[in-house]
From Swiss-Prot:
GO cellular component term of the entry, any: host cell plasma membrane
Protein name, per record: Fusion glycoprotein F0
Assembly information from the UniProt record: Homotrimer of disulfide-linked F1-F2. Interacts with HN and M proteins.
Residues bearing carbohydrate: 104, 245, 449
Transmembrane annotation, as ranges: 501-521
Site (Cleavage) location in chain: 116-117
Membrane topology: Single-pass type I membrane protein; Single-pass membrane protein
Function noted in UniProt: Class I viral fusion protein. Under the current model, the protein has at least 3 conformational states: pre-fusion native state, pre-hairpin intermediate state, and post-fusion hairpin state. During viral and plasma cell membrane fusion, the heptad repeat (HR) regions assume a trimer-of-hairpins structure, positioning the fusion peptide in close proximity to the C-terminal region of the ectodomain. The formation of this structure appears to drive apposition and subsequent fusion of viral and plasma cell membranes.
Organism encoding this protein: Sendai virus (strain Ohita)
Gene label: F
Length: 565
């Protein structure tokens, strides 16, 4: 059975590695670095959904049953010191409870208003009676009251026992740790010293130990004693929580070793003071330990961008600050509510965000879809660390190499230049000198002719990309419109031109003038002929517009008849 479980664990680990490798292969980091986009290797994602609860009951004053009152004066002075620390904390807790408790206006038979606790606070959220801070505090206080009976029993038992540490469980299985860190010292050191060294010497040793304990108490729990809100527990406090052995966390919390490292590294184990007992000098803390769940096959990459040159102009690619990639998804990541450890991002919910399609294709290596903006000032970064070396825009910057400050001349066909320990040990960019890592290496992707997407203004990514897409559409439409106009201009060019129309108009005017002149000439000619023959006789040989009518059967018969008459 054990062998089978080990095999299953090995297969699961192998699948996790394969998924992580596939996800990391989605983003061509070397290719993007050639246009100034720097993407790191990425970290895994863990969701902190639920938490485990623990309670710590600190007994700050040891139980002393010494003969002749040895050490009583030192204990009184120590209690006075504790009062100055604990009284403000107790008053703040009383104020918190007074603010959270909501008075019910419903009167009882004795006309005395009843007091309701946590449920009334939750019920009045919509009415704005309780603030969110009060609700949060109310939840913690309600949980404390649920465990109050168990904690009270532990307090009672602590006053009757001489054990320094007791680990119990309440009714719901939550652990309650009772700490009496001074009790072992009293039992093992002070009591034997009374018979050997005398009462005065033993009292002095007790006073020194009480002072030392107060200092250690402030070191371990000082941040928690300074407020009634949640504060991260220190490693010293965690050690006391797990019986002075922090490795026991692995066995008492239902989580893995990597998760424990993450919550400790990010200080996500929170402690809240929920009770102060000035009679017994006991302080109760509620401890919440988050339970992490890793999302398989997901990486969150940190992305940044520097300027690069293309065709003699300086440009800048707009990318989201964080990229989330999984096998079937590539988008942005909102890590505002997340915390970052060395190996992972811990988030309260899935931080995935949608990004435009053009930006997805850009991140996947299609540089023609990358949204860019033209650089007009020096605010845009000019260099960044990548693969242990430096990637820099040495056309827009002054770059030097080596201890001799040799100037670097960047090929104008390349967007950026890669500088490593092998080709340039001491790197200088605009007067800033940097030493490259000896393990750094050059980018493996060959430089090609770079083409980029539309130019946009630097503003929220989604708006800019939509504007850029609209600009592309308008430009394409304008080009098609010009083609259509050109085609139309080729159709019927000889009569659609302006010169042709003018020529036609001139010809028509000339023809009209000629006709008018001919009519005038004919009219004047006829008039002159009539004036030259006043009797109305017109010679036969003279040309006239009147028709000469002759009979078709006789030759001159009509004229003869006319002469007889």
């Amino acid at each position: 059975m054990a062998t089978y479980i080990q095999r299953v664990q090995c297969i699961s680990a192998l699948l996790s590695v394969v998924l992580t490798t596939l996800v990391s292969c989605q983003i061509p980091r070397d290719r993007l670095s050639n246009i100034g986009v720097i993407v790191d290797e990425g970290k895994s994602l863990k969701i902190a959904g639920s938490h485990e609860s623990r309670y710590i009951v600190l007994s700050l004053v040891p139980g002393i049953d010494l003969e002749n009152g040895c050490g009583t004066a030192q204990v009184i002075q120590y209690k006075s010191l504790l009062n100055r620390l604990l009284i403000p904390l107790r008053d703040a807790l009383d104020l918190q409870e007074a603010l959270i408790t909501v008075t019910n206006d419903t009167m009882t038979g004795a006309d005395v208003p009843q007091s309701r606790f946590f449920g009334a606070v939750i019920g009045t959220i919509a009415l704005g009676v309780a603030t969110s801070a009060q609700i949060t505090a109310g939840i913690a206080l309600a949980e404390a009251r649920e465990a109050k009976r168990d904690i009270a029993l532990i307090k009672e038992s602590m006053t009757k026992t001489h054990k320094s540490i007791e680990l119990l469980q309440n009714a719901v299985g939550e652990q309650i740790l009772a700490l009496k860190t001074l009790q072992d010292f009293v039992n093992d050191e002070i009591k034997p010293a009374i018979s050997e060294l005398g009462c005065e010497t033993a009292a002095l040793r007790l006073g020194i130990k009480l002072t030392q304990h107060y200092s250690e108490l402030l070191t371990a729990f000082g941040s928690n004693f300074g407020t009634i809100g949640e504060k991260s527990l220190t490693l010293q406090a965690l050690s006391s929580l797990y019986s002075a052995n922090i490795t026991e966390i692995m066995t008492t919390i239902r989580t893995g070793q990597s998760n424990i490292y993450d919550v400790i590294y990010t200080e996500q184990i929170k402690g809240t003071v929920i009770d102060v007992d000035l009679e017994r000098y006991m302080v109760t803390l509620s401890v919440k330990i988050p339970i992490l769940s890793e999302v398989p096959g997901v990486l969150i990459h940190k992305a940044s961008s520097i300027s690069y040159n293309i065709d003699g102009e300086e440009w800048y690619v707009t990318v989201p600050s964080h990229i989330l990639s999984r096998a079937s998804f590539l988008g942005g990541a909102n890590i505002a509510d997340c915390v970052e450890s060395r190996l992972t991002y811990i988030c309260p919910r899935d931080p995935a965000q949608l990004i435009p399609d053009s930006q997805q294709k850009c991140i996947l290596g299609d540089t023609t879809r990358c949204p860019v903006t033209k650089v007009v000032d020096n605010i845009i970064p000019k260099f960044a660390f990548v693969n242990g070396g430096v990637v820099a825009n040495c056309i827009a910057s002054t770059c030097t190499c080596g201890t001799g400050r040799r100037p670097i001349s960047q090929d104008r066909s390349k967007g950026v230049v890669f500088l490593t320990h092998d080709n340039c040990g001491l790197i200088g960019v605009n007067g800033i000198e940097l030493y490259a890592n000896r393990k750094g290496h050059d980018a493996t992707w060959g430089v090609q002719n770079l083409t980029v997407g539309p130019a946009i203004a630097i503003r929220p990514v989604d708006i800019s990309l939509n504007l850029a897409a609209a600009t592309d559409f308008l430009q394409d439409s304008r080009a098609e419109l010009e083609k259509a106009r050109k085609i139309l201009s080729e159709v019927g060019r000889w009569y659609n031109s302006g010169a042709t129309l003018i020529t036609i108009i001139v010809v028509m005017i000339v023809v009209l003038v000629v006709i008018i002149v001919i009519v005038i000439v004919l009219y004047r000619l006829r008039r002159s002929m009539l004036m030259s023959n006043p009797a109305g006789r017109i010679s036969r040989d003279t040309y006239t517009l009147e028709p000469k009518i002759r009979h078709m059967y006789t030759n001159g018969g009509f004229d003869a008849m006319t002469e007889k008459r």
